[in-house]
A protein has these predicted regions:
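Active-site SXXK
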Residues: 7-35, 70, 209
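Structured C-terminal helix/loop/strand segments within mature extracytoplasmic catalytic/sensor domains
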Residues: 4, 84-85, 89-90, 132, ...
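Short, well-structured active-site flanking segments
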Residues: 22-45, 89, 144-148
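Extracytoplasmic
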Residues: 3, 9-11, 15, 30-32, ...
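Mid-domain, small-residue-enriched loop/turn segments at the edges of structured enzyme/sensor domains
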Residues: 59, 80-142
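Flexible glycine/proline-enriched surface loops and loop-helix/loop-strand junctions
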Residues: 2, 62-66, 73-79, 110-118, ...
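Structural recognition of the beta-strand scaffold that forms the well-ordered cores
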Residues: 9, 69, 81, 103-107, ...
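Conserved catalytic neighborhood of penicillin-recognizing serine enzymes
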Residues: 42-81, 89
Length: 217
């Protein structure tokens, strides 16, 4: 089923992180670099531990911490703040395409998908292209080791999807992954139930995997 355009949902936060880290790498910006976030950027009625902690107030936060919120906690507001920092969703799409990844599309932010849930179908990838991107990010020198190591450490700390890729694996298996899922609509259909990442087995064997399920009932 690799020809299907699977909606990524929050898996696209991995693509966003790559573009952000590329900008930081090119401009030699440290992970502890502080960015100012306005209270108006912390949208209500969306999943956001960041907003729960800082509701109604401006804040200054390190870029590295914003990335942790977006990847490990799948914070939607943190993701959109990072999209803006990276230059917009169109720039992120072009960055990923320049890496040689073709069977995907990114055109929507978390806010635009929240306003019109059908737009979530516009952010899509094939499973094999997602695996290619994961492998490339792990094996190629896309940016300095300090950024690369931070990304994979953050992915191993993902708090969502303990019943997905990690499900029945031995407890000492290392899994660096990004999940993505939707609620079921009124007809009981779930747009997406996804998990993609790198798995390092206790014996040291490594593999990359993307599991995408769409429109399940």
């Amino acid at each position: 089923n690799n020809e299907v355009h699977y909606p990524l949902l929050s898996v696209f936060k991995f693509h966003v992180a790559l573009a952000v880290l590329d900008k930081m790498n090119r401009e030699e910006i440290p992970l502890k670099h502080i960015v100012h976030v306005k209270a108006s950027q912390l949208q209500p009625n969306t999943y956001s531990p960041l907003r729960q902690k800082h509701s109604g107030q401006d804040l200054d936060i390190p870029l590295g911490e914003l990335l942790q919120y977006s990847i490990s906690l799948s914070d939607n507001n943190a993701c959109d703040i990072l999209i803006e920092y990276a230059g917009g969703i169109g720039h992120i799409h072009q960055y990923i395409r320049k890496l040689g990844i073709n069977d995907f599309n990114l055109s929507e932010t978390e806010d635009s998908m929240h306003r019109n849930p059908q737009k979530a179908y516009a952010n899509w990838s094939t499973p094999s292209e997602m695996v290619r991107l994961l492998k490339m990010a792990d094996e190629k020198d896309l940016f300095a080791p300090v950024y690369r190591d931070f990304l994979w450490k953050t992915m191993t700390e993902t708090a969502t999807g303990s019943n997905k890729l990690k499900g029945l694996l031995p407890s000492n298996t290392v899994v660096g992954h990004k999940t993505g899922s939707s609620d079921r609509n009124l007809k009981g259909v779930k747009m997406a139930d996804n998990d993609a990442g790198v798995v390092i087995m206790p014996g040291g064997k490594k593999y990359y995997i993307a599991v995408f399920v769409t429109d399940s009932s």
